[in-house]
C-alpha cells in the first residue's frame, strides 16, 4: 500500500508501462484480435476500455469492471509457485503443480517456466570438484574475497563475487561452505575446474536450458526450469544415475491389454561415490545451514518471529534430508530442492516478472518462500504410510574412500593433518 508502483519495485512508470504492454502482446486477447485482423490501434483501445470480467482472488473468483490492461497489472500482484516431485530410482513423477489456478493463470511454471536458479546450481559445481579433484566435505578452504582474472574461463572482466552480507575471514570446510552458500568458496572451485566440466555434468543430468560458459554460473545465473532441476537432483539421490522423468508409465485398453509402456531412459553420470559425497554435502544444508528451519526453531528465534512469517513453522523433521536453498538477485526467486532416498521434490516461488520481489531477504529468501511448501508437502506425505516415503538415510557405497566424517581426524585425500594445508595449496587453493 505504501508503494506507488506496486507490485513492482525499482521501476519507473515508463518502464512499468513497457512491461505491461509486452505482457499484453503475449495475451490470448491480443492473439485473437490479431487473428481477427484488428490493427494495433484498435487492439490498444480495447485494452484501455473498462469491461465486465471475472478475476481471481484468494477468497474466490469475483466479478468486477476494469480495463484488460489494469487486469494485467492486478494479476502481477500475485506470487506464483510451482512444485514437482519424483521418485529418483524409477523416474516416476509423483506430483506436479504448475501453478495455483489454471483457469486464470494458464502457464505451467514447472515445464514452461525458466527462472534464475541461484544457489541451487552450486551442487553441480561441487559435484564436479569432488569427481575431478577427489575433494572431501572436510577439506578446508579460505572464505576470503577471491577474483577470477580477466580473460579466464570465458570471462572478459575480472569476476569477484561477494558473500551475502559481505561477511568473510574464516576457513570453512566444503560442507559448511555449501550449507551456508558461501560464494567465495564457489568462486575458488570454479577457478579450479572451469565452467566447461560443470556444464557438461549438468547436461548429462538433464539440464537442457542455455548455460553460458562463464564462471558466474557457479552462483546460479542461468534460467532453468523446475522440471530440469528435479530430474538433475534425482541423479544425486540415485547413486549418480540420471533417470529421465516419466509422467505416463503405460497405457492399457479397457481389457487391460498394454498398448504402450515406457522404458526408462537412464544415463550413468557420476560415480556412486561422488554422488554420495555430494548428497552428504547437501545434508549439511538441513543440519546446520540455510535449510535448518526444517529441523527446529532457529537460533535467532528470540530476535525474529519466524512463526509470523513462515507458514507451518516449525516443522521439526528428524529424518535425513538433503537439500539446497536458492535465492536470486533482489529476492526475485526463491527455490528449495529437497531429497530423501526415494523422493526428490523441488519448489519455486516468485513473481510473474523479476521486478516483482521482496525488499527484505528475510521474506524473499528460498528458505522463507519455497522451503515451507516443501515442508508441508512432505509432512502430509509422511502422514500417509501407504506412500512408502523413506525415513531412512541415503545408502552409502560399499567402498567409500573419500572421508565425510569431519568430526574424526581421518586423513583427507590420503594426507595427514600436518601436510593437509600444503596439499590444498598444491591444488591451487
Enumerate the language-model features and the residues they cover:
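A penicillin-recognizing enzyme superfamily signal
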Residues: 1-87, 92, 96, 102-107, ...
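Short active-site loop at a secondary-structure junction
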Residues: 75-81, 104-124, 138-140, 171-172, ...
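Secondary-structure transition/capping motifs at alpha-helix termini
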Residues: 88, 103, 130-139, 208-210, ...
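Extracellular glycan-interaction surfaces
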Residues: 127
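Short polybasic/polar patches that bind polyanions
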Residues: 130, 191, 203, 237
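Conserved catalytic neighborhood of penicillin-recognizing serine enzymes
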Residues: 135-198, 242, 252-283
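Mid-domain, small-residue-enriched loop/turn segments at the edges of structured enzyme/sensor domains
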Residues: 155-160, 192-231
